């Protein structure tokens, strides 16, 4: 009777997770029930935003080693497979921490155009300056970037699990 009913109620209980934001001294600021995450509901604008930010992170140089290191981590967290290799090869030839000692590179994305279900064409301009913002060069680039939605591995840098799988970028002459 009663024992069976208590067991049934206990076995039916569900824990509902909450996301809670706290101050540095532990005081709760906000809290909300965590919803299940369905990657098929990621809006196209969010994907475009991630690809836009990737170009800024991967190609820009702030001239501040802390910012540049954070941008390197952010760009790497958005890549996997061939794209990770392409990015690593690029950084071996164009290390933002070395470049940033004598130059800054500002990125201006000009457009993002979907080409296939998971590939975008992105064009941008790179303006290289001295640390005092004197122009050094201006170059235009274009890339085909392919992405996929996967499991979230890095909540800080890639909370949506949007991974760039292939990068083909070239300078426009």
Give residue spans per PLM region.
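Short, aromatic-enriched amphipathic alpha-helices that serve as compact interaction elements
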Residues: 46-71
């Amino acid at each position: 009777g009663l024992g069976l009913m208590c067991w049934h109620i206990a076995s039916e209980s569900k824990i509902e997770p909450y996301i809670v934001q706290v101050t540095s001294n532990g005081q709760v600021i906000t809290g909300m029930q965590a919803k299940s995450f369905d990657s098929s509901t990621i809006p196209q604008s969010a994907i475009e935003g991630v690809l836009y930010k990737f170009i800024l992170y991967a190609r820009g140089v702030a001239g501040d080693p802390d910012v540049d290191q954070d941008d390197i981590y952010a760009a790497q967290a958005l890549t996997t497979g061939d794209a990770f290799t392409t990015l690593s090869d690029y950084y071996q030839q164009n290390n933002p921490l070395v470049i940033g000692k004598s130059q800054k590179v500002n990125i201006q994305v000009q457009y993002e155009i979907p080409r296939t279900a998971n590939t975008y064409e992105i064009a941008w301009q790179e303006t290289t300056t001295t640390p005092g913002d004197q122009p050094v060069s201006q170059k235009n680039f274009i890339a085909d970037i392919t992405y996929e939605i996967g499991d979230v591995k890095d909540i800080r840098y890639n909370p949506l699990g949007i991974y760039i799988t292939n990068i083909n970028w070239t300078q426009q002459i």
